[in-house]
Amino acid sequence: MLSVAQSSALFLLQAICILYITKLTIPTPVSEINLVRQSDCVCVPIISRSGTDYITCFNNCQIEPINTKLYNSTCTKMVNITLVRCNNEVYVMTLPNLVSNRSHSWEVLINYLLRFISAIIVYLLLSISKQGIFLFFSIVHYSFKFIKNKKSCNICGNDFYFIHIDCPKPDFTKRSDFHMMFYIILFLSLFFVVTHADDNVYNYYEHGDLTEIQLLDKEHYSQDFVSDGFLYNFYVENSHLIYDISNISTITRPVKHNEVTSTWSCDGSSGCYKDHVGKYNKKPDYVLKKVHDGFSCFFTTATICGTCKSEHIAIGDHVRVINVKPYIHIVVKTANKTDKIVIDEFNKFIHEPYYIKPITQIHIDQHDFLVTGSKVYQGTFCERPSKSCFGPNYITSDKTVTLHEPKIRDTFTHDREYIIDYCDYPSNSDLESLELTDMVHHSDKIYSPYDFGLISIGIPKLGYLAGGFCESLVSVKKIEVYGCYDCQNGVKISVTYESSDSCHTLICKHDSTTHRYFVQQHTTTLNFHSFMSKKDTIIECNQMRKALNLDESSETSVYFESNGVKGSAKEPVNFDFIKNLLYIDYKKIIFVFLVAIISIGIFLRSPYMLLSSILKFRKRRKVVATNRSEQLVMDDDVDVFIGPPS
């Protein structure tokens, strides 16, 4: 048997083992789990729809909303401009505009019809201005006499500077050369109005080893560009102005008014004034003669005078803008690579990762604002106490400034009571009298949404195309399509292919649309945007086919807008709309046919008149040449028969 000492030692050893095993099996506290997850957090905001609201989420990140409310621990509801703190950094997001679920094919059709209408308007305006244009041509032609020596026609004697078509020269409204120039201008105007793609007007310019694009600065707008066959997607994540501000004063509003000193006299205002100074050693703020005083005075009524003060509450800070700078974030995706362009200064060249031309300094009209919390108001603010501006009472440099104009009134009771309406002037302190802006204030900065128009971005040429090096087709492994048919959002097409040490070509076809892109070496995925008009359709990418059954349009599907630019610097005119116009249902075809019947006469008239002017021009030149030859022959005959005797 074990001794008592051995038993005690064995019991102690068992207890230690049990405690050690228990410690190993105790769950990690929730706070420790959160710390571990928070340490793995990468703050990347993701915007999505939840019912009728937009929310932004930071996966695996604990966030702190600044001007909105939490949706859950990692998501927050969105307002016009949403500020969220994640990992001690402030992220700015703008509420997306509601993407319409209208029919994309009808939208495209209406867009094409608007081009036709624009062409008709151009035709009518030029036709109405025809005589004025001829007069302008005549004035320009006449002005050449100051810079060019004129010539004289041997047949009709008229002066000319370049060419002489009409002989004799007619009125300027009937000149053949003016008609020809007019119809050339008219024809080219109609041609470019109809065929020039609205998304592609400002997009591409070639500059040596760069392809310059003009990016539309519109938040939550996704734009595709092709540079030397390679597809680039630019997504405008943020576009704001940031105002650095300085505090001018804290505007206050009087909310409670109290009597400080008071006295009365039967000797009128002067007597009351004298009594108050003698009693309190200060001048009274107000003087009131009672109508009834309860027989305080026998031969007159009492005069009351005294002082008062107001208790104030702060309603906001009057701030002034001292500096303005841009806040632009653009996400660029090409194949498996993602870059981010950050523009945070005006008049600054950016060379990496893309060449960015400087943005011109923005001049703002409003420099003074009132901020309270995250809200920003604008109006006319007081620099000194006045009734003609907002905030006559304020605190600046630890000094309280008030518009002290007490207002009291008689109670008309038989005593010396009176009512103090106010001591410090309370009006012009109501926030409802100011204009609430869509800006957001946080930490001595004001964030204001702003579109900078077109941003010039230079895409470096990759240099893979020498000798048709990229022409071989890449081997496609998988095709995925996300989105809806015949909707404003369109579809996102993701093609997975085999990685290679060299670049290759990817050709995808669906409906009447063909997408042709080069894929970079050592990449496996290419994403691009497109539109499909049918629910059931087939997409083919490098001989891999996939049947699609797309969903209907949904307002909750995608929150950003996309364009359909698929041109290049070498194709400034977009002719794809002609094919797409034919690939629509019979209802739209009938509608287009009716419009075309009305328009075709107008559009055919322009090339007809141009051709007529050219033929007339050539015919008159032949006539002039013939007349000149006959005149020379007649001159020779005259020299022979009526010349001087030999």
Swiss-Prot record:
It comes from the Viruses. Specific enzymatic cleavages in vivo yield mature proteins including glycoprotein G1 and glycoprotein G2. Residues 141-176, 610-646 are cytoplasmic. Glycans are attached at N72, N80, N101, N247, N336. Residues 1-25 form the signal peptide. GO terms for cellular component: host cell Golgi membrane; membrane; virion membrane. Keywords: Glycoprotein, Host Golgi apparatus, Host membrane, Membrane, Signal, Transmembrane, Transmembrane helix, Virion. The record marks A197, D198 as: Cleavage. G2 and G1 interact with each other. Glycoprotein G2 and glycoprotein G1 interact with each other and are present at the surface of the virion. They are able to attach the virion to a cell receptor and to promote fusion of membranes after endocytosis of the virion. This is Envelope glycoprotein. It comes from European mountain ash ringspot-associated virus (isolate Sorbus aucuparia).
